[in-house]
């Protein structure tokens, strides 16, 4: 029984899934916006928010924990120098997930996950 087991397996083994999360979080911080499937976006949201919280703490221990997870040293520097100070007054909710329809090849539901800095303006609905 899988009672109280949180998280999605996403059809991958543990090591593959963890590597994918590390790659996606690194890309999210490098580009500040990525397009992925709904399930992956929902899973990396919690990891990304924890990394930003580490960046807000800003001490050496937090830097080392983040560097052990994020794959590129330049992205760790960006997280601690530009991304984390942007959210020093915000107590969580650093990312936004926007649903963008389905993928052409397999109709998988797709989303954009981005860092909340720019104001979101929804498209005008056709009346």
From Swiss-Prot:
Matches recorded under NCBIfam families: L17
Disulfide bonds: none
GO molecular function: structural constituent of ribosome
Keyword annotations of the record: Ribonucleoprotein, Ribosomal protein
Subunit description: Part of the 50S ribosomal subunit. Contacts protein L32.
Any Pfam family matching the protein: Ribosomal_L17
Record keyword Ribosomal protein present: yes
Family named by the database record: Belongs to the bacterial ribosomal protein bL17 family.
Protein name: Large ribosomal subunit protein bL17
Biological process (GO), any one: translation
PROSITE patterns: RIBOSOMAL_L17
Biological source species: Pelobacter propionicus (strain DSM 2379 / NBRC 103807 / OttBd1)
This protein's GO CC annotations: cytosolic large ribosomal subunit
């Amino acid at each position: 029984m899988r009672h109280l087991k949180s998280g999605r397996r996403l059809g991958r083994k543990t090591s593959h899934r963890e590597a994918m999360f590390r790659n996606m979080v690194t890309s999210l911080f490098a580009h500040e916006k990525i397009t992925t499937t709904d399930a992956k976006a929902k899973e990396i949201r919690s990891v990304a928010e924890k990394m930003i919280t580490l960046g807000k703490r800003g001490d050496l221990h937090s830097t080392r924990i983040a560097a052990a997870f994020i794959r590129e040293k330049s992205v760790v520097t960006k997280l601690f120098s530009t991304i984390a100070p942007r959210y020093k007054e915000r107590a969580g909710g650093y990312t936004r997930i926007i649903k963008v329809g389905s993928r052409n090849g397999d109709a998988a539901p797709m989303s954009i996950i981005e860092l909340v800095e720019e104001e979101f303006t929804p498209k005008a609905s056709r009346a």
